[in-house]
């Protein structure tokens, strides 16, 4: 598949299509910050971290803070899955909803809250071809899936080739916490394979089948 070269003019979608003024600090929507000038998206979770300062560290408040994170594409999956694992551990220890957390769990929750502030250092390009200045010769989807005793994940990358080399960008991911009832690694990886297959189908349909599925890697067991 061949695509037309991207325009060399430094004009962002915000300026050319939406008529938004440049030079501002960007637009913040649902915890995401859109930089008009650079045409990048950054998860802004500092407000949630500050909110946590006024809340006691309890089992109830962990999912309460997690619910404030808007990440439909799973771009910060490692951050959200950590909170889910900690909440599951609190359930495993049969901690009451309003009882204060202590020990290792409390320290882990506090470390997770601090990591929310660091998410502002993560930036994603809104446009997949943002820095491409030559003709795209081929593009494809590459999927990866794996599982552990605590969680499992599927992730899809968009890979495209030009005359100067190959480039890849993460498109989306799905993360899940392993069930409280312990399952074997092979069974968890089979579940992960199903998630990857569904996610790949969704992404391909969203792109109107303009790309091919070149590679799907699963865990070593499956």
Task: List each language-model region with its residue ranges.
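RNase H catalytic domain
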Residues: 1-5, 195-222
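Acidic, metal-ligating active-site segments
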Residues: 139, 143-168
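Flexible loop/turn segments at secondary-structure boundaries
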Residues: 2-5, 79, 86-89, 149-152, ...
């Amino acid at each position: 598949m061949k695509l037309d070269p991207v325009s060399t003019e430094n004009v962002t979608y915000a300026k050319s299509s939406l008529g938004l003024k440049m030079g501002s600090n960007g637009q913040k929507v649902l915890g995401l910050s859109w930089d008009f000038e650079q045409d990048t998206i950054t998860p802004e979770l500092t407000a949630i971290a500050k909110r946590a300062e006024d809340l006691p560290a309890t089992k109830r408040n962990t999912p309460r803070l997690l619910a404030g994170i808007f990440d439909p594409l799973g771009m910060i999956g490692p951050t959200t899955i950590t909170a889910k694992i900690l909440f599951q551990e609190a359930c495993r220890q049969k901690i009451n909803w309003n009882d204060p957390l202590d020990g290792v769990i409390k320290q882990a929750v506090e470390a997770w809250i601090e990591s929310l502030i660091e998410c502002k250092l993560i930036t994603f390009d809104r446009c997949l071809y943002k820095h491409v200045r030559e003709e795209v010769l081929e593009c494809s989807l590459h999927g990866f899936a794996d599982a552990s005793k605590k969680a499992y994940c599927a992730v899809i990358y968009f890979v495209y080739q030009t005359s100067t080399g190959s480039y890849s960008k993460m498109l989306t991911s799905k993360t899940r916490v392993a069930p409280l009832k312990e399952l074997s690694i092979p069974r968890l990886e089979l579940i992960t394979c199903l998630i990857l297959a569904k996610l790949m189908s969704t992404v391909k349909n969203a792109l109107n089948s303009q790309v091919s599925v070149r590679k799907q890697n699963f865990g070593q067991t499956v």
